[in-house]
Amino acid sequence: MDLTLFIFFLILLLAFANGTNDVSKAIATLVGSGIANYGTAIAWGTFWTMVGASASAFVASAMVKTFSSGFIEPGLVIPAVFAPAVLCGAILWVLFASKTGLPVSTTHALTGSLVGGGVLAFGLDGLIWSTVSKKIVLPLLLSPILSFGLSMLLHPLLAVITKRWEGLCVCIMPSHRALVTIDPQGGTRTLFQAGGIGMPVAAVPSQCDRAGLSGPTIGLDSLHWLSSGLASLARGTNDAPKIAAMLLLGGTMTTWPSPTWHILAFTGVALAMGIGSYWGGLRVTEVLAERVTKMNHAEGLSANLTTSSLVLLSGTFGLPVSTTHISSSAIIGIGLLRGISSLRWTTVRDIVLAWLITIPAAACLACAAYFLLSMALQTF
């Protein structure tokens, strides 16, 4: 098999593995707060993940550069087995974690594989350690701390707002060309209408019942859905370029030979992430939705807003972060606001251990794959 095609196959497999583990990070709050069932939430997260992964082809060139060549000393000859070994290390670890229900970071797995395989292939002097530390390790270490703190600061503010707006919704009425608010007592008030502002609309039902309204209704649940979609989109935008970059790591290509190859690579990654998300995302979603802490609607919204804002911001600067660490830290931070006893510490312990083990485990798997692939290449 042609080396480039073999690497592309492994890239698709890693994208699939990423989907099985990472789709949960943006949708677990929908299930945990009781807004959606698993099937609907996973389908929602899958769609926006694929949108984000596809869009990253046009906005994530800095991330591609970092993971394809930014940490290897220029001028080194990259062995043919290097990229396949790196991919195998990450694939094996992420699939194992998904099977056992552990939320782990594909970014950490790739980083561990790159460093482990890089040291074996080039020695300690072959890696640009300043790039590894500043552009990869530092953002990965700081992001969960920032997420933990931001969620604990953001949620009390959102809790005040949502308590004030509890039961309030906005009805969009195209036939009346109006936006109408309905309070929990059934009172109505026009936000906007062609004929006037602030006038009661008697035709609107006294209950905020979606089935009885003459137009779609927007409430707190709608904002939670939107925040989940945004977090899924951000995840796709952040993860897809790291995976696609492996095609430029030691294959027959070091740059995209044509726009067609560029689009093909990201389209393949987006589809594989979507397939993995939809058919394999249940197990890890169950862990984050039910086994860390209980959440209400406002808490779920706070966690998703924290996740989406940090992941999108990091992507703007081309900094790789772990959606896993950010979303899990946000959920844990919000759980602590309820009190220490509200967290299931055995689950938190397992999650933290999985975080700590991911980089060395992926590094060891990449080294083993490098050795076995080198032996196979010499044999055949």
Predicted regions and their residues:
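N-terminal signal-anchor module of multipass membrane proteins
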Residues: 2-55
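Intrinsically disordered, low-complexity non-transmembrane regions of multi-pass membrane transporters
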Residues: 157-227, 341-342, 380
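Alpha-helical transmembrane segments in multi-pass membrane proteins
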Residues: 7-14, 44-52, 56, 60, ...
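Structural signal for the N-terminal portions of transmembrane helices
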Residues: 127-145, 260-265, 344-360, 364
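Juxtamembrane boundary at the C-terminal end of a transmembrane helix
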Residues: 368-380
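Membrane-interface alpha-helices at helix entry/exit sites of multi-pass transporters
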Residues: 34-47, 80, 258-263, 297-302, ...
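Transmembrane helical segments that form the transport core of multi-pass membrane transport proteins
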Residues: 231-303, 334
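Short, non-helical or kinked segments that cap or interrupt transmembrane helices
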Residues: 20-27, 35, 100-112, 238-245, ...
